[in-house]
Amino acid sequence: MKAIGVTGPGRTDVNLLDIPEPPPPGRGQVVVEIEAAGVGPWDRLLNTGGWDVGLRPPAALGVEGVGRVCAVGPGVQGISLGDRVLAHDAPLPGGSGFWTEQVLVTAAHAALVPDALDPVVLAALPVNGLTAVQALVVLGLTAGQRLLITNGGGSTGALAIQLAAVAGVEVTATASPSAADRLREYGASEVIDYRDPAWSDRAQGGFDAALIAVPGTATRALPLVRDGGQLCSLTSDAPASERGIASTDLYVRPDAAQLTQLTTDLAQGRLRLAPEPVPLTDGPDAYDRVLTGRTAGHKLVLVP
């Protein structure tokens, strides 16, 4: 079957491949026929040791997607043949990812999703959405508190803005001027140009928490957090704690219950996404665009 991935361990070049269909599902596993699969900057880590997801090349990349269950292993509960599911899976039980036609998935990591929702929009949700949710859980903010998000224009930052705003949190975000109107529509009370050398001065400080979604901003954001506040970094660069501030790095984990809630938020209009669909056969170009920042702020989604 067609796949976009790597041919050997440590390879960084991504190509169109022909790989075998996944094996029959084992206990607690399902095979999913892919409708759409998300592409993210994290995918470059899957075959270089940065994120060990159990990839066994030649294999497809990708750790998120949506599709129909076409085989069900023993011991699976709540998921049946023909169900439509959305998943972020890591490690990958079949040693191969979602950028293909079929993939083996851990059933406990899959959430049932309605037929009416656009597969391209759904496939853009798992990794970024789960990261945003899990970061906000760590920060533990309540209505009326203030949150600083660096890179609010990115896929994770934009979802975090929307989720925080729904909870009544006041959000200030850094982003490009071209993204400012969109982020205000999402609920940001203030958007600061990240290219302004004095952006941290403009932010004024006194935030209850900071969410770091772009490398190199954590040390400038920390002084803007009040004593006893929180900082959560998504870029593995949380600075040492000071002034009683809890400073932590967060790494996304699969969570079907959180995916179900995100899907509900999407269906009920509380979340908005604008991903760009790309044919699976154009996957190498899509991967390169993501790594070089040529996506115009859109999440790219591969469609077989």
Residue ranges with predicted function:
Residues 21-38, 50-91:
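Glycine-rich beta-strand-centered segment in the early N-terminal region that forms part
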Residues 125-193:
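Mid-domain Rossmann-like dinucleotide-binding core that forms the NAD(H)/NADP(H) cofactor-binding site
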